[in-house]
Amino acid sequence: MKHLIALRHLIILSCLGAVSAGAGTLFCGAYPYWVLVIDEGQGKVTDRIRMETGLPTSIRISHDHKTIFVTTNDRSGIEVIDVATRKVTNHFVLNDATHKFRLNGGAPDPDGKLLYATTTQITKQADRYEIGKAKYTIIDLAQQKIGKTVDMPGANDTAGGAEGGGAAGGGGGGGRGGGGFEVSPDGKFLYQFGSTVTVLNAADFSVVERIQLAQPDAPAVENLGLGGLLEAVSDPGQRVSIFNYSDPIVHNRVFGLARFDLNTRKFDFTPIGPAPVAMTGLHVTPDKKSGYTVSTNGTGGNKRCEFWGIDLTTSRLTRTGEFPCRTRYSFGISADGKKLYIYGAGYEIEVYDAVTFKHEATWDLGNDMTGGGLVVLP
């Protein structure tokens, strides 16, 4: 029997290519309307880019790493930042006097001209607000408007009822109403990760294929789940993530690595060991040999958080190290892969050494960060 994979806890981080060692630059959203630019070498904010359309809720890098796309909350805005000049080159809002949109994520096409997302339209009537169905949406950045919408198959009258609903909010390109998007290297197909992987035609969202993701060579499993974002690995179109599953008898949970090829549409699973209560997404070093995740066990005063280092060449857990838990937090990695970051919600980024897992510094940003993700560039 095949056991389907459910994508959850989608978080947005840029998929990094190979980068040289040395300090990089971080971009993150902050209240009330900023994108902060942080120099890794100095450990401080070196620039603040004001968003004209409101509070940043998601942030994503283009395929060529030259442009950053930001979605904002106040009026369902979209802003485009040029990385070199750190200037906003384009901004607009989708809302008007009688229509509002719940905009979830935004995955750019390879040319950086379109954003693929899911939206829900809220129409103001004379005596009520009418909430429409969740729709696949193409946003034309040059024309500053929605170019095409298509009803999502299986969507109910509200966004929450969409088939394969994934993590809420901005990070991964889909969010509530359908899970995260990945765009194929040639820009012709979209991959939507939910209870199945749905392959869509990027031009009209017609379904090309539905991939039922089964655990190979392990027939006695249930509740197979893919956690966190899909990180880039060495070859174009290759992605890797954490997965977990449980056996159907005593329900012991196991985690491991899942690799997905966007070109061949094939998955490969490698179990590693017993799964903790919760895990963040996997972050990969520039040489693609090591990956890091954060595990959480317990609750309240008994909560325990650990960094886990994974050798991607052997798919083995090689190192662990405990750090002080936060009630809410996100996890990131530096441009050279030598530092690990614990950040949000709050004003500070805690910096840890990726080899020893020892705390090295606390960066005070002077602004409360949003949960929209972190873009890391060399």
Regions picked out by a protein language model, each given a short descriptive name:
Residues 8-20:
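Bacterial N-terminal signal peptides
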Residues 18-378:
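Predominantly soluble domains enriched in secretory-pathway, periplasmic, or organellar proteins
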